[in-house]
């Protein structure tokens, strides 16, 4: 096992993880902006759900809450809003893969 190769691998993994998290947060902000601009007209009392938002955005949707006396939730596809799906970076190949 090459110690330097593993160090480089884990450093690259950390960088990819951080960058992917930034991309998801940028996409989440787009979803919040779309909700404020378009969905508030149809659902005056609504907002974007933060819980598990990263998994949802990676899967191509986001969830809003709607309060009409009782709170309900609705999944909104990114493509239906004109928001491009998030394109995440691939992780590096493990040094012991070959």
List each language-model region with its residue ranges:
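Acidic, low-complexity, intrinsically disordered interaction modules
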Residues: 18-98
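Extreme N-terminal leader/activation tails
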Residues: 1-9
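N-terminal acidic leader/helix
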Residues: 11-18
């Amino acid at each position: 096992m090459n110690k330097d190769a593993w160090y480089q691998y884990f450093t690259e993994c950390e960088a990819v993880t951080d960058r992917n998290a930034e991309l998801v947060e940028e996409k989440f902000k787009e979803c919040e902006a779309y909700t404020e601009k378009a969905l508030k007209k149809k659902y005056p009392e609504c907002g974007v759900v933060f819980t598990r938002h990263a998994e949802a955005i990676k899967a191509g949707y986001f969830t809003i809450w709607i309060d009409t006396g009782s709170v309900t939730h609705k999944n909104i596809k990114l493509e239906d809003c004109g928001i491009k799906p998030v394109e995440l970076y691939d992780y590096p190949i493990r040094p012991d893969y070959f």
